[in-house]
């Protein structure tokens, strides 16, 4: 389907995604909120910092946006909600009774000890590099998630998310000795929302880019207007010094 200029980005996305072009007002509103919450998040996140660094070299807009996309493609930046979705499916596959809090808690402990899922010792969707008390984006988003889950008849799945949200901070403090404060981030629920909207997983990161291109563009404009020097971060070598080894003696 072709886009309709009279519709919002969220409405057009859902309209073009679906064979019947139909969507509910709540679906469009929830996706619109998701795009708003992902549109900008300061200059320190990896893709936005990439935009500013590349812009400072004097390159063109297309190249700066391409560099930002390369950053977002990395799973540590753009793939967080995918990891949450894979983890949640792993939990469903391995619990006998998904509503049993004791069994769920035991499995979350296995995750933290690197004994389950990808064995990285993480509960994905929990914690953030900047936020400790709460991720304000998640606080705003959760109310819409609850409304959509109710409309879609997914209250049981929502319950699993909210129980993990309740248990995880205490378990992380208890098992990993991390006491600075851990709370769910926006990625914890975003994949669940996209799934309820029928959006394929392959589009989760591109959808992130659809939103974040606004923030990238704003930072690029600011860099062009207010800075006149190339960004060159300082680095300090921590490798120590070593005696020179002749090439003939090197392994």
Residue ranges of predicted features:
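Non-transmembrane, aqueous-exposed alpha-helical and coiled segments at domain scale
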Residues: 1-251
């Amino acid at each position: 389907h072709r886009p309709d200029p009279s519709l919002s980005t969220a409405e057009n996305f859902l309209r073009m995604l679906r064979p019947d072009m139909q969507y509910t007002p709540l679906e469009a509103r929830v996706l619109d909120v998701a795009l708003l919450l992902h549109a900008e998040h300061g200059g320190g996140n990896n893709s936005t910092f990439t935009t500013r660094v590349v812009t400072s070299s004097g390159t063109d807009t297309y190249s700066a946006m391409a560099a930002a996309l390369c950053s977002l493609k990395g799973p540590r930046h753009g793939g967080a909600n995918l990891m949450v979705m894979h983890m949640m499916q792993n939990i469903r596959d391995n619990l006998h009774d998904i509503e049993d809090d004791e069994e769920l808690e035991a499995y979350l402990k296995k995750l933290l000890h690197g004994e389950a899922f990808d064995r990285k010792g993480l509960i994905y969707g929990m914690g953030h590099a900047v936020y400790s008390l709460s991720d304000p984006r998640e606080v705003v988003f959760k109310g819409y998630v609850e409304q959509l889950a109710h409309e879609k008849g997914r209250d049981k799945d929502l319950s699993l998310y909210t129980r993990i949200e309740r248990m995880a901070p205490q378990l992380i403090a208890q098992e990993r000795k991390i006491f600075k404060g851990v709370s769910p981030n926006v990625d914890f629920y975003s994949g669940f929302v996209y799934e309820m909207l029928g959006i394929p997983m392959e589009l989760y990161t591109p959808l992130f880019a659809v939103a974040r291109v606004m923030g990238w563009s704003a930072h690029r404009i600011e860099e062009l207007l207010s800075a006149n020097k190339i960004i060159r971060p300082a680095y300090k070598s921590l490798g120590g010094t070593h005696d020179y080894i002749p090439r003939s003696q090197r392994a």
